[in-house]
């Protein structure tokens, strides 16, 4: 699944958009997922990582 972080397993959350007249329509909030080349067990690999994991330094970037 492309909208899931491979590090922390963050995934989309679901809810409603509520208009002024209180009409509810279903919608989803996606996490900010980026494709990043990282080092996993000494080999570079491409992972889907959320930006909160990138800012926290939970992955090591491959150059």
Curated annotation (Swiss-Prot):
Q: Which Gene3D superfamilies does the UniProt record give? A: Ribosomal protein L28/L24
Can you supply one Gene Ontology CC term for this chain's record?
Answer: ribonucleoprotein complex
Query: Which Pfam families is this protein grouped with?
Result: Ribosomal_L28
Quote the SUPFAM superfamilies the UniProt record gives: L28p-like (SSF143800)
InterPro entries found in the cross-reference section: Bacterial_rp_bL28 (IPR050096), Ribosomal_bL28 (IPR026569), Ribosomal_bL28/bL31-like_sf (IPR034704), Ribosomal_bL28_bact-type (IPR001383), Ribosomal_bL28_sf (IPR037147)
Query: Would the keyword Ribonucleoprotein be found if you checked this record's keyword annotation?
Result: yes
Please name the GO terms of the biological process aspect recorded for this protein, alphabetically: translation
For whether the record's keyword set contains Disulfide bond, the answer is: no
HAMAP family, per the entry: Ribosomal_bL28
In which family does this protein belong, per the annotation? Answer: Belongs to the bacterial ribosomal protein bL28 family.
PANTHER family referenced in this protein's UniProt entry, alphabetically: 50S RIBOSOMAL PROTEIN L28 (PTHR39080), LARGE RIBOSOMAL SUBUNIT PROTEIN BL28A (PTHR39080:SF1)
Quote the protein name from its UniProt record: Large ribosomal subunit protein bL28
User: In which organism is this protein found?
Assistant: Beutenbergia cavernae (strain ATCC BAA-8 / DSM 12333 / CCUG 43141 / JCM 11478 / NBRC 16432 / NCIMB 13614 / HKI 0122)
């Amino acid at each position: 699944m492309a909208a899931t972080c491979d590090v922390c397993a963050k995934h989309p959350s679901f809810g409603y958009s509520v208009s002024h007249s209180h009409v509810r329509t279903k919608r989803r909030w996606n996490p900010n997922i980026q494709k990043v080349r990282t080092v996993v067990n000494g080999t570079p690999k491409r992972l889907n990582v959320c930006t909160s994991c990138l800012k926290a330094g939970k992955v090591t970037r491959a150059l």
